[in-house]
UniProtKB/Swiss-Prot annotation:
Cofactor note: Binds 2 magnesium ions per monomer.
Positions with a binding annotation for Mg(2+) 2: 222-223
UniProt catalytic activity: N-(5-phospho-beta-D-ribosyl)anthranilate + diphosphate = 5-phospho-alpha-D-ribose 1-diphosphate + anthranilate
Designated name of the protein: Anthranilate phosphoribosyltransferase
Role this protein plays: Catalyzes the transfer of the phosphoribosyl group of 5-phosphorylribose-1-pyrophosphate (PRPP) to anthranilate to yield N-(5'-phosphoribosyl)-anthranilate (PRA).
Taxonomic path: Archaea, Methanobacteriati, Methanobacteriota, Stenosarchaea group, Halobacteria
Gene designation per UniProt: trpD
Keywords attached to this entry: Amino-acid biosynthesis, Aromatic amino acid biosynthesis, Glycosyltransferase, Magnesium, Metal-binding, Transferase, Tryptophan biosynthesis
GO BP field: L-tryptophan biosynthetic process
InterPro entries: Anthranilate_Pribosyl_Tfrase, Glycosyl_Trfase_fam3, Glycosyl_Trfase_fam3_N_dom, Glycosyl_Trfase_fam3_N_dom_sf, Nuc_phospho_transferase
Length: 333
């Protein structure tokens, strides 16, 4: 670990394999001072794509992993930290995706930077959020969807809580959550808080085991937005293509950003229920359609983003999305 700290402090980039080993040392034997020193040095130097991929692989290796017998598994998970308290877009979208027949292994946590994280809103709406890995695996196989709470599946992360808190700044771990799905999802939609991270995380994902992914940033949001142009990087194996999409490209209307504002977990749970049951129209429904459609597309279940949005719309309008919520609430670990 001392060698890695020295080299990174001197401005040297680590290889992906070295970054993976450094992550293992962080989780297994490094002191808090060493962890803080490495994270600070990486931040000062600037984390490279191979370093991000290597750390993500090391974090995955330390996780409690599951292997549900459903495919293609998809995850919708963002970095958070975009500074906008919107409704719970990726979480609500997950039910729409699963309702469309695409199995979902949702990875998430309690809120860090917003009023309501995925775990907060799911707990409020009556879903068991802290199930053990075998139970989540069964849940995905039986209902088509499961929620993996980060602290349950990533106990090794306890080692970095203290150093991260004391540093008080963003580190490489702020972008690793979406890259460390414990079910090794086949396809992902990854939202990022900074547009500059779109090509960075797309490149990192292309170096990992994910088959297909969309890395997205929507005019200030770590989601595909419905208030302007969104930047998208599409990962297919080792290839990456970057482009932009507008709401009209997806077949939804444009809205003001303020129209997708969220609130407390209670308020966001009410919005989630209303959207899934077809009682909420307008911007909040449209942003869910856009992001659910993206997940359906990248899972290979639609030929285009717009076709994915059509499938998402059908999931809500037929009652399938609401039924998916009911089945997850009723599942007993």
């Amino acid at each position: 670990m001392k060698d890695y700290i020295r080299r990174v402090s001197d401005g040297e980039d680590l290889t992906q394999a070295e970054a993976r080993e450094a992550a293992s040392l962080v989780f297994e034997e490094a002191t808090e001072a060493q962890i803080g020193a490495l994270l600070s040095a990486l931040r000062a130097k600037g984390e490279t794509e191979p370093e991000i991929a290597g750390f993500a692989e090391g974090m995955r290796a330390a996780a409690r992993r599951i292997d549900p017998d459903r495919s293609p598994l998809v995850d919708t998970c963002g970095t958070g930290g975009d500074g906008h308290d919107t409704i719970n877009v990726s979480t609500t979208s997950s039910f729409v995706v699963a309702g469309a027949g695409v199995p979902v292994a949702k990875h998430g946590n309690y809120s860090v930077s917003s009023s309501s994280g995925s775990a907060d809103v799911l707990e409020e709406i009556g879903v068991t959020i802290d199930a053990e890995p075998p139970a989540v695996e069964t849940c995905i196989e039986e209902t088509g969807m499961g929620f993996m709470l980060a602290p349950v599946f990533h106990p090794a992360m306890k080692a970095v809580i203290g150093p991260r808190k004391e540093l008080g700044m963003r580190t490489i771990f702020n972008v690793l959550g979406p890259l460390t799905n414990p079910a090794d999802a086949d396809a992902q939609v990854v939202g990022v808080y900074d547009e500059a991270l779109v090509p960075t995380l797309a490149d990192a994902l292309s170096r990992m085991s994910v088959d297909r992914a969309l890395v997205v940033h929507g005019a200030g949001l770590d989601e595909i937005g419905v208030h302007g142009e969104s930047t998208v990087a599409e990962v297919d194996g080792e290839s990456v293509e970057q482009y932009t999409v507008t709401p009209s490209d997806l077949g939804v209307d444009s809205h003001d950003l303020s129209a997708v504002a969220g609130g407390s977990p209670t308020e966001n749970a009410a919005d989630m229920r209303g959207i899934l049951e077809g009682d909420v129209e307008g911007a909040k429904r449209d942003i869910i359609l856009a992001n659910a459609g993206a997940a359906i597309y990248i899972a290979g279940e639609a030929d285009s983003l717009a076709a994915g949005v059509d499938a998402a719309r059908e999931s809500i309008d037929t009652g399938a999305a609401a039924a998916q919520l009911a089945s997850l609430r009723e599942f007993e670990p």
